[in-house]
UniProtKB/Swiss-Prot annotation:
Pathway: Amino-acid degradation; L-phenylalanine degradation; acetoacetate and fumarate from L-phenylalanine: step 4/6
Name listed for the protein in its UniProt record: Homogentisate 1,2-dioxygenase
Protein task: Involved in the catabolism of homogentisate (2,5-dihydroxyphenylacetate or 2,5-OH-PhAc), a central intermediate in the degradation of phenylalanine and tyrosine. Catalyzes the oxidative ring cleavage of the aromatic ring of homogentisate to yield maleylacetoacetate.
Keyword annotations from UniProtKB, A to Z: Dioxygenase, Iron, Metal-binding, Oxidoreductase, Phenylalanine catabolism, Tyrosine catabolism
Annotated catalytic residues: H303 (proton acceptor)
Record field: catalytic activity: homogentisate + O2 = 4-maleylacetoacetate + H(+)
GO MF term set: homogentisate 1,2-dioxygenase activity; iron ion binding
Binding site for Fe cation: H346, E352, H382
Record-stated family: Belongs to the homogentisate dioxygenase family.
Species, as recorded: Bradyrhizobium diazoefficiens (strain JCM 10833 / BCRC 13528 / IAM 13628 / NBRC 14792 / USDA 110)
Binding-site residues, homogentisate: Y361, H382
Coiled coil feature spans: none
Length: 448
């Protein structure tokens, strides 16, 4: 190339045009569904190929530091101003946003059985049920923990969330998320993250689906620092998958739902908004298989802090204090010598919302089942139940592999307030605290 060569004259192989995914976390990706749809050497040419419109989607302020600056350039059939109309308020159902003070419940440790999947037809937008909220959606701080129940695919319906990014934690049933950036297929054991402002619809290819949904009002999820662990283990960047471009050119009416300022709005469009033919950038949806997480732990003695199981973190303005940590408890070996191996008894400045995707959780072998949930708020004590304590205190300390298990936690610096729905749910275990009743006084000053 000489100094007179324009970027459009550069010969190169086209960006990825085959169906599938691109590997990596936070990469600057590029992909096109039609050869040559992606401009070379510039973002906003005078005329885009194929008559497309160039549009930037910013996930951070323009002046954010390079390491946290997120944006993507989309080359679409219509600009997003054509994916808008006269909005009207829509029924949000059981979807709530922080601050939510609709129920004043005495402080307590709480646990719920799985929420039954309804028999009636329910789409994703209709099927979100909020369990807890924390922080304030209007200050972009905090989170909400939801359950989603889906028995019907969204057909000629789309949605985007202006209040935060969404993390789907699949528990039962597969999902297909058709997004502006491409298509994501996921199964239980995987998570999908949809950034703030990205349009999508949810389909269920194999029947009803249930799972957990974290709505992150704060900074985008990112990989945690590994510190002395080094360059490997935990969630490795190469295992995150971002979809390749895949567009629709459909001139059929569709409803667009938007969550904004804690409320739900809707409008009708004459066409599908899934019309991005090519894109490049680092602000995009992705999925991750939790079974590829490489855990680290104690190989001598003692039980390390659960932060070593952090998959993703949403940082706050205070170093080391997360807006949200997404933590999992996967299959792993327990080998510590002369050690109480389950999670220890604990009072925590952070607030913990837990769920179980499959298997048995070692600290609660009874009562905490797949699809269930628990809440241990700021400075409320929690820990193993009596059976877990007795087994761990008296069992033979040989190496044990915990298999077929996957629990998770949404941990936040903000107290989590339960919604009226969660407080009055028939699945709430009124006797949850009884799991610790059998813990007897064992103190004997005459027996060291």
């Amino acid at each position: 190339m000489n100094i007179n060569t324009s970027p459009d004259q550069i010969i190169r192989s086209s960006a990825q045009v085959t169906p599938g995914y691109m590997s990596g976390f936070g990469n600057s990706f590029e992909t096109e569904a039609l050869p040559g749809a992606l401009p070379i050497g510039r973002n906003s040419p005078q005329r885009c190929a194929y008559g497309l419109y160039a549009e930037q989607l910013s996930g951070s302020p323009f002046t954010a530091p390079r390491g946290t600056n997120e944006r993507s350039w989309l080359y679409r059939i219509r600009p997003s101003v054509k994916h808008s109309g006269r909005f009207e308020k829509a029924d949000a159902g059981l979807w709530r946003s922080a601050p939510c003070h609709e129920y004043d419940l005495p402080i307590a440790q709480m646990r719920w059985d799985p929420t039954p999947v309804p028999k009636e037809e329910v789409t994703f937008v209709q099927g979100v049920q909020t369990m807890t909220t924390a922080g304030d959606v209007n200050t972009q701080a905090g989170m909400a923990a939801h359950v989603y129940l889906i028995t019907k695919s969204m057909v000629d319906q789309h949605f985007y969330n202006a209040d935060g990014e969404l993390m789907f934690v699949l528990q039962q049933g597969n999902l297909r998320l058709v997004t502006e950036f491409g298509r994501i297929d996921a199964e239980p054991g995987e998570i999908v993250v949809i950034p703030r402002g990205v349009k999508f619809r949810v389909e269920i290819p194999n029947g009803p689906a249930r799972g957990y949904l974290c709505e992150n009002y704060g900074g985008a999820f990112t990989l945690p620092e590994r510190g002395p662990i080094g360059a490997n283990c935990l969630a490795n960047a190469r295992d995150f998958l971002t979809p390749v471009a895949n567009y629709e050119d459909k001139d059929t009416p569709t409803e667009l739902f938007v969550k904004w300022g804690g409320s739900l709005f809707k409008t009708t469009l004459p066409h599908s908004p899934i019309d991005v033919v090519a894109w490049h950038g680092n602000y995009a949806p992705y999925k991750y298989d939790l079974r590829t997480f490489s855990p680290v732990g104690a190989i001598g003695f003692d039980h390390p802090d659960p932060s070593i199981f952090t998959v993703l973190t949403s940082p706050s303005e205070t170093a080391g204090t997360a807006n949200i940590d997404f933590v999992i408890f996967p299959e792993r070996w327990m080998v510590a010598d002369n050690t109480f191996r389950p999670p220890w008894y604990h009072m925590n400045i952070m607030s913990e919302f837990m769920g179980l995707i499959y298997g048995v959780y070692d600290a609660k072998p009874q009562g905490f089942v797949p699809g269930g949930m628990s809440l241990h708020n700021c400075m409320l004590p929690h820990g193993p139940d009596r059976d877990a304590f007795e087994h761990a205190s008296n069992g033979e300390l040989k190496p044990v592999k915990l298999t077929g298990t996957m629990a998770f936690m949404f941990e936040t610096r903000y107290p989590q307030r339960v919604t009226a729905h969660a407080a009055n749910a028939s699945t709430l275990q009124d006797d949850y605290a009884d799991c610790w009743k059998g813990l007897e006084k064992r103190f004997d000053p005459n027996r060291p």
